[in-house]
Design a protein with these regions (language model features):
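Conserved N-terminal phosphate-binding loop of PLP-dependent enzymes in the Aspartate aminotransferase
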Residues: 1-225
């Protein structure tokens, strides 16, 4: 499970949910897997890995995407207990596993994140961005909720009865494209604007994003009532 549900609409898990889930899974003999593909590598700001937000330790962690900063690479990290299960003669084989170019790039990505304090940037600049988005939420009734952590944020668009406004979400993303800003939607109803910029995003970038969001939210089409 993802520590913050991404394609489900940037949904933050209730406090204690993951701890309780892990307990039930382990009592049933299962293993706990944390999908860190989207939320990992400091993007959430408060922690390097998403599972750390919930005070749990998974048995398996899956990582990818930002690991190579555009270059294809993924990895699975597991506990020693699970790794030892492969010591019985069973062998895992992957034709492209351990590719030296991919591994070299991933190593540099990890170093770059650390050298440039990008987790701290996600915390501080992402926090600033969320505060500015909440200001828009108070200004425009169409914004049902702003949620997320660091540079992993979502804006849910709803009417006064909390009905999802997918058409308005699509309108907004297409209008933003006209200003050179590429965004997309998530969630089962397609009404959540996802905001996941590169974690080198700075305050000036945030201000530009807010400027155009404010402009579009003020357009007649976005006034649903």
């Amino acid at each position: 499970i993802e520590p913050i549900i991404s394609c489900g609409g940037q949904v933050e898990l209730p406090k204690g949910f993951l701890q309780s889930s892990y307990n039930y899974i382990r009592k049933a003999g299962g293993v706990c897997v944390s999908d860190e593909v989207q939320v990992g590598f400091g993007r959430l700001g408060k922690s390097y890995w998403g599972f750390e937000l919930h005070d749990v330790i998974p048995d398996i962690i899956t990582i990818g995407k930002p690991f190579g900063n555009g270059h294809p690479i993924g990895a699975v990290v597991c506990s020693e207990e699970i790794a030892n299960k492969f010591a019985n003669g069973m062998e895992f084989f992957n034709t492209f596993g351990g590719n030296p170019v991919s591994c070299s790039i991933a190593t540099e990505v990890l170093s770059f994140i650390e050298r440039n304090n990008l987790q701290k940037n996600a915390l501080l600049t992402g926090g600033y961005l969320k505060k500015e988005l909440i200001k828009l939420e108070k200004k425009y009734p169409i914004i049902g909720q702003v949620r997320g952590e660091g540079f992993f944020l979502g804006i849910e668009l709803t009417d006064n009865e909390l009905n999802p406004l997918e058409e308005h979400a699509n309108y907004l993303t297409n209008r933003m494209r006209e200003f050179g800003i590429f965004m997309s939607t998530d969630g089962p109803d397609g009404n959540v604007i996802k905001i996941k910029p590169p974690i080198i995003f700075n305050k000036e970038d945030c201000d530009k994003l807010i400027l155009y969001l404010d402009k579009i939210f003020d357009e007649d089409f976005m006034k649903f009532y």
